[in-house]
């Protein structure tokens, strides 16, 4: 019997994985882009995921919902994220994947994941709607050669 694609026990079961500490986004265990989540001392700081408007998006399973929208506050091609029932959101809500501030780059997040539009489009067009947020993505060690 194969492992379900959306298993919560296997990091590799998720098409999309986002690491709070590094801002790395991976698809099927391959690096795709680096963004950020959180503001000021909370930016990419997993220890502050519980602090509203400061910490990064909380760890757990999220569903990427759509269709993408254009908003005045967050710009074009914004993706909404909905937490799975078991994801501890720390009473935080309204998480999105959107673009950075053009006027003040690096300051657009109060917990949302910030990625370039081309990457947001890639995420949506992939058809994969499950995102796993983790504190860090384990480093991949090269296989020993014989």
Q: For each predicted feature, which ranges?
A:
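Gly/Pro-biased beta-strand-loop elements
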Residues: 2-93
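Exported/periplasmic cell-wall-interacting domains
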Residues: 61, 66-146
